[in-house]
């Protein structure tokens, strides 16, 4: 029964000027319909993406807008979950991706599952997988809510304070036809989606199209040259239809004002609505027609310099876009060869496991990292975290890895990352990926002296390596933050030569479910501050 249809159990006093008497509230007539009281439970998902470290379930703060000013947003528990010293907040809605195996959420991101590394019993090497939670049945029903301008802006902008020192526009962004008259710059050397998901790769045509009809092109905000796609579907392959829909949504909602983006995101006539309706009806020709319309209309705005002007007023990238760019890079470089990461030496320091995108976002925010600071990842794997810090924050970002296969994949990601950033028109921070033992790499030892945040995923490190790291921390500057899965301070406070106790202040924290690749469970981590 609805709470508005229950009989009142209370009596209240109503004060009148000269007379005081007890008045019983009128009893409401009981409703014949049976309705339940809505509840806000802790809806769980196996892989969560949750933005923002140390945030409360509802917090207001300043975020960048296209006009260069800031506005205040409040994030509900359905969008964020906080990290606390005592408990883990139930997992929330932002679910994506991650290292090494991105997962899936219901907001239109890639729905394909990564290839499983056949080492499920070899924790922590085993990446975490989730089932596809998307359904074509929820295409049109919630369309207007999904495209409501205020909700869309709330999704796009983050709670991170504005970093006014960050310059977001890529130096090689296409500035329109006038720029071509001066110098015609070649397009970025990306790995096109059609190179990894196509009929040639034994995929099947999607949306009822014939083989000769699947080829399409997709326009991006930063370059005049589009990406080639084939509208196909296949196991462990890029979902071209969802990828295209997501690019259209992010390009319009991030790079344009509400008025400029109306043609793409209008509730009734928007191009994105046309794409979704065509997908739900398996209308291939209709989908292709809507895509051509998007390409033409967005290119018109690019020719007028609208994208460049708007980017110049922005100082940060929405996390939704950060995650999507990183996933695009991963899909085209690591995913086709992910089985290489299963080759490791059991019981050694060379065990592969990654921290997922939302965990890194939390860390970057909690440590107050900005574009003028330095981030170092010791044991950087395929480079996911190093690239994320450079893109999300714009800071100088270093990584060092000694496993050969991981290093090779990291280099492939690095090349595609630079090309993708240019394709999207955004400038990342400087990235440096080093090979070898970080205890002996001269460049790493030198950059540690000026590092502001150091990440060490020491979940599977030997005690000897952890002790070696403590010795390296002696060279860190005062105030440097060290993020680790295990503490470097011994439980025995009287342990001889316990250097960590004398140089580190340690804060113990809890992360929610889905934050790491080797398990879906929650866990603990530490933030140590050099003193």
UniProtKB/Swiss-Prot annotation:
One Gene Ontology term of the molecular function aspect: histone H3K79 methyltransferase activity
Gene Ontology cellular component terms for the protein in this record: chromosome, telomeric region; nucleosome; nucleus
Ranges of biased composition (kind: Acidic residues): 132-146
Pfam families xrefs: DOT1
Biased composition (Polar residues): 79-102
SUPFAM superfamilies linked to this entry: S-adenosyl-L-methionine-dependent methyltransferases
Keywords associated with the record: Chromatin regulator, Methyltransferase, Nucleus, Repeat, S-adenosyl-L-methionine, Transcription, Transcription regulation, Transferase
Record has Lipid biosynthesis as a keyword: no
InterPro entries in the record: Dot1, DOT1_dom, H3-K79_meTrfase, SAM-dependent_MTases_sf
Family membership: Belongs to the class I-like SAM-binding methyltransferase superfamily. DOT1 family.
Further details from the record: In contrast to other lysine histone methyltransferases, it does not contain a SET domain, suggesting the existence of another mechanism for methylation of lysine residues of histones.
Protein name, UniProt field: Histone-lysine N-methyltransferase, H3 lysine-79 specific
Lineage, broadest ranks: Eukaryota, Fungi, Dikarya, Ascomycota, Pezizomycotina
């Amino acid at each position: 029964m609805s709470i508005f249809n229950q009989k009142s159990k209370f009596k209240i006093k109503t004060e009148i000027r000269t007379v005081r008497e007890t008045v019983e509230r009128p009893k409401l007539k009981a409703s014949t319909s049976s309705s339940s009281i809505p509840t806000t439970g802790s809806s769980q998902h196996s892989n969560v993406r949750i933005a923002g470290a140390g945030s409360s379930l509802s917090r207001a703060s300043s975020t960048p807008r296209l006009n260069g000013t800031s506005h205040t947003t409040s994030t509900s528990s359905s969008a964020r979950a906080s990290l606390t010293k005592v408990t883990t907040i139930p997992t929330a809605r932002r679910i994506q991706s991650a290292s090494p195996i991105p997962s899936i959420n219901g907001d239109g991101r890639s729905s394909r599952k990564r290839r499983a590394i056949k080492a499920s019993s070899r924790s922590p090497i085993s990446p975490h997988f989730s089932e596809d939670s998307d359904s074509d049945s929820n295409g049109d029903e919630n369309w207007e809510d999904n495209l409501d301008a205020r909700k869309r802006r709330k999704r796009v902008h983050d709670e991170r304070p504005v970093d006014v020192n960050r310059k977001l526009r890529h130096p090689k962004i296409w500035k329109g036809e006038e720029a071509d008259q001066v110098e015609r710059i070649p397009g970025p050397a990306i790995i096109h989606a059609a190179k990894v998901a196509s009929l040639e790769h034994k995929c099947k045509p999607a949306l009822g199209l014939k083989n000769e009809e699947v080829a399409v092109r997709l326009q991006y905000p930063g370059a005049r040259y589009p990406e080639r796609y084939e509208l196909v579907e296949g196991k462990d392959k890029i979902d071209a239809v969802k990828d295209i829909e997501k690019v259209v949504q992010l390009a319009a909602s991030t790079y344009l004002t509400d008025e400029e983006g109306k043609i793409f995101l209008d509730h009734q006539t928007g191009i994105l609505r046309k794409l979704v309706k065509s997908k739900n009806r398996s209308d291939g020709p209709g989908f292709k027609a809507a895509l051509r319309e998007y390409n033409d209309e967005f290119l018109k705005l690019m020719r007028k310099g609208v994208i460049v002007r708007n980017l110049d007023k922005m100082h940060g990238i929405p996390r939704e876009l950060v995650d999507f760019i990183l996933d695009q890079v991963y899909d085209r470089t690591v995913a086709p060869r992910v089985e290489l990461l299963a080759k490791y030496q059991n019981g050694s320091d060379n065990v592969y496991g990654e921290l997922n995108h939302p965990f890194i976002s939390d860390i970057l925010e909690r440590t107050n990292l900005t574009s003028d600071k330095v981030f170092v990842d010791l044991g950087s794997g395929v480079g996911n975290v190093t690239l994320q810090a450079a893109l999300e924050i714009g800071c100088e970002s270093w990584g060092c890895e000694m496993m050969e296969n991981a290093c090779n994949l990291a280099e492939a990601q690095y090349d595609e990352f630079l090309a993708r950033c240019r394709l999207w028109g955004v400038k990342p921070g400087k990235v440096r990926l080093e090979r070898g033992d970080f205890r002996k790499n001269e460049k790493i030892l030198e950059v540690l002296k000026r590092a502001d945040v150091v990440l060490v995923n020491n979940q599977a490190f030997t005690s000897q390596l952890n002790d070696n790291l403590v010795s390296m921390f002696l060279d860190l500057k005062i105030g440097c933050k060290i993020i680790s899965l295990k503490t470097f301070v011994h439980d025995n406070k009287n342990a001889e030569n316990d250097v960590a106790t004398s140089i580190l202040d340690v804060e113990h924290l809890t992360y929610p479910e889905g934050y790491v690749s080797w398990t879906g469970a929650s866990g603990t981590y530490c933030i140590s501050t050099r003193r």
